[in-house]
A protein has these predicted regions:
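N-terminal intrinsically disordered/low-complexity leader segments
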Residues: 1-7, 74, 197-199
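Alpha-helical DNA-contacting segments of helix-turn-helix folds
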Residues: 20, 55-62, 70, 107, ...
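Amphipathic alpha-helical packing segments from all-alpha helical-bundle domains
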Residues: 71, 108, 115-139, 148-152, ...
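Amphipathic alpha-helical segments used for helix-helix packing
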Residues: 98-115, 163-171
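Helix-turn-helix
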Residues: 11, 15, 22-53
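Generic hydrophobic, amphipathic alpha-helix propensity
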Residues: 8-17, 33, 58-66, 70
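Hydrophobic alpha-helical connector segments
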Residues: 57, 71-99, 141-144, 150-154
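Amphipathic C-terminal alpha-helical segment
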Residues: 154-173, 191-199
């Protein structure tokens, strides 16, 4: 066990993020985080009173990363049209959800009440704001009510894809081999997003 001189809180969060992605949030505990960070079992309690506090921090980091990825997808090429940026953002969202499945699951898990964690709520809102901005750009003059409805509809579409493919429910329902559905969806995702936008 090492004597810690650096930023203990940041190291604990990093360890928690690693464990969450590798094994899922069910396998996270303050003790397992301490072991991963190679510090005493009491060390995490200096920064996190409960496991939920730590889960909220991991979830917040996930939303911050998602917002960053969506922003990068939207701004990667200044010559892209708003429609093209929307499609790239949708692709980036699904890719994030599939490649970081355990973190993604925690981000949308009901075990954390976002209302109890203002910074987590702000991070989640920031990620959703990226969708709001592009939908508003695609629909000049759209009312707030219609903007909300469209954003929720498009979010539900990509969120549903992540859930179906990530849990292999598509494979089971259509009789394909494990992993085939993911390849199909990834290959045709941009076409799907184009149709979703025109729906």
């Amino acid at each position: 066990m090492k004597y810690h001189h650096g930023n203990l809180k940041e190291e604990l969060i990093s360890s928690a993020c690693n464990i969450c992605e590798a094994s899922g949030h069910d396998h996270m505990s303050l003790r397992s985080i301490a072991k991963e960070a190679n510090v005493s079992q009491t060390a995490p309690y200096r920064h996190f009173k409960t496991k939920e506090d730590l889960l909220a921090e991991v979830s917040k980091r996930g939303f911050e990363k998602l917002a960053e990825i969506l922003n990068q997808a939207s701004s990667q090429n200044e010559n892209m049209t708003a429609k093209e940026r929307f499609i790239e953002m949708g692709f980036a969202y699904v890719k994030f959800g599939l490649e970081r499945k355990n973190t993604y699951d925690l981000m949308h898990s009901p075990i954390i009440d976002k209302a109890d964690f203002p910074e987590l709520l702000e991070a989640a809102s920031s990620a959703f704001d990226e969708l709001i901005k592009i939908i508003a750009e695609l629909n000049p003059g759209i009312s707030d009510a219609d903007l909300s409805r469209q954003c929720i509809r498009h979010w539900a579409q990509v969120h549903g894809l992540v859930g179906l493919v990530g849990d292999t429910k598509i494979d089971e329902s259509v009789g394909t081999k494990a992993g085939d559905a993911m390849s199909i969806v990834t290959k045709d995702l941009r076409s799907f997003l184009t149709m979703a936008l025109d729906f």
